[in-house]
């Protein structure tokens, strides 16, 4: 399993990406078995030291590819631009930066990217922050787009405009996986803008679709 790891230090934190292995797929020893595979990004021109997260990994031929959501400030700008970062590995433990894609027109932080192929076309699902700022709609949404993607170079380009998967916050941070029958199944985070006043939690997972 791959996930984001961020130890707190005086209410500040740095974001690393880690791998953890389980013999049965259910039991994980998070204290002893996790291994940092991507250290915090210190190059501000590449990504954000804190807000780089949500790894998704797949295998292509004899190589693994990892996609991350992040943001950075372009030269000459004072605003963040959302982006995805690509890393590759031969053994799933030693990773190297490969490529990136960004678009300043699509929000200012790209969360939970998921890139996959359907009928010879690549689909990108992600959840940009501050995508809409009209005062009427939620600023964060889950969107999708057909993209051009080369597995060898990890060169990606959004071919068309992004489209909202579902309106509102009832579906956010959506991710897909393949079931045992070969179907691609999507599950998201169903949440509301603020937590209930008498509870310590917010949201739940959606039904698979």
Q: Each predicted region: which residue ranges?
A:
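Glycine-rich, aromatic-lined ligand/substrate-binding cores of catalytic
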Residues: 173, 183, 209
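Beta-propeller and closely related beta-sheet repeat lectin domains
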Residues: 50-56, 111-114, 172-175
């Amino acid at each position: 399993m791959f996930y984001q790891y961020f130890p707190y230090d005086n209410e500040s934190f740095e974001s690393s990406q880690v791998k953890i292995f389980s013999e049965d797929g259910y039991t994980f020893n998070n204290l002893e078995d996790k291994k940092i595979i991507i250290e915090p990004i210190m190059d501000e021109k590449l990504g954000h030291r804190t807000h780089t997260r949500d790894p998704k990994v797949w295998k292509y031929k004899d190589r693994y590819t990892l996609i991350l959501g992040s943001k950075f400030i372009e030269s000459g700008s004072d605003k963040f631009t959302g982006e995805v970062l690509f890393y590759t590995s031969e053994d799933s433990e030693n990773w190297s930066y490969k490529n990136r894609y960004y678009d300043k027109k699509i929000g200012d932080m790209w969360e939970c990217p998921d890139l996959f192929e359907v009928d010879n076309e690549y689909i990108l699902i992600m959840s940009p922050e501050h995508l809409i700022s009209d005062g009427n709609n939620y600023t964060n949404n889950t969107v999708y787009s057909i993209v051009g993607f080369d597995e060898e170079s990890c060169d990606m380009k959004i071919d068309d405009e992004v489209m909202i998967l579902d309106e509102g916050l009832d579906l956010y941070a959506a991710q897909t996986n393949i079931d045992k029958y070969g179907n691609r199944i999507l599950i998201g985070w169903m949440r509301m803008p603020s937590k209930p006043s008498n509870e310590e939690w917010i949201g739940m997972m959606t039904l698979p679709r």
